[in-house]
């Protein structure tokens, strides 16, 4: 049966039993049906047990609009999950990050949510490395001195396109791909803002 509450519950049980399951709930909208399992069990159990138990489950969910997927398949709820203690929230924008982040997530002792924008699903690319990706830092995708554009996931290509158009007008921008929504890499953002003194945030959520 289609039961996101059940899928995530089974994943949590498997994680507690020593496995490292990957649960796919198709779209972020339907993850709301599993919110109790995610918030009250997966995210909280390590802290409730003083570290005696961990829940190394990875939950993948598609997010984002613009693909004619109807109202129940196109929400962007990653900002909700980014406010839940005990969860790491990842948002890959490239094929390499989508692969590498999943590899790294499978080594985490805590639950990881990967919000995957639907726009890049049809992208293909050669991977330079099959190694896990560092999920503790944002990535500077373009260098500039006049403004900082901060984006993540499916908004990163749009931010890069905008930066290219601005460059033609003589405005050079840093483009930061957050990559990790929780915990945020404040240091990378602040370093850029201290240089440019101007910030534009591109965000569907």
Locate predicted features.
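Conserved thiamine diphosphate
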Residues: 3-8, 12-150, 155-158, 173
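A glycine- and small/hydrophobic-rich beta-loop-beta segment
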Residues: 140, 167, 191-192
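Hydrophobic, well-ordered secondary-structure elements that form the walls
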Residues: 149, 166, 177, 200
């Amino acid at each position: 049966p289609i039961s996101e509450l059940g899928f995530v519950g089974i994943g949590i049980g498997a994680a507690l039993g020593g496995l490292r399951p990957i649960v796919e709930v198709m779209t972020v909208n339907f993850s709301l049906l599993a919110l109790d399992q995610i918030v009250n069990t997966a995210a909280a159990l390590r802290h409730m047990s003083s570290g005696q138990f961990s829940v190394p489950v990875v939950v993948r969910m598609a997010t984002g609009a613009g693909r004619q997927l109807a109202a129940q398949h196109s929400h962007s709820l990653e900002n909700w999950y980014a406010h839940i203690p005990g969860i790491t929230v990842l948002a890959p924008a490239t094929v390499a990050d989508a692969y590498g982040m999943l590899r790294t997530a499978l080594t985490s002792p805590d639950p990881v949510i990967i919000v995957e924008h639907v726009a890049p699903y049809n992208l293909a690319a050669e991977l330079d490395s099959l190694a896990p990706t560092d999920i503790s830092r944002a990535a500077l995708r373009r260098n500039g001195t006049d403004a900082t554009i901060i984006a993540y996931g499916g908004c990163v290509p749009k931010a890069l396109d905008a930066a290219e158009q601005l460059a033609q007008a003589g405005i050079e921008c840093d483009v930061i791909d957050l990559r990790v929504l929780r915990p945020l890499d404040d240091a990378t953002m602040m370093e850029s803002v201290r240089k440019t003194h101007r910030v534009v945030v591109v965000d569907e959520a």
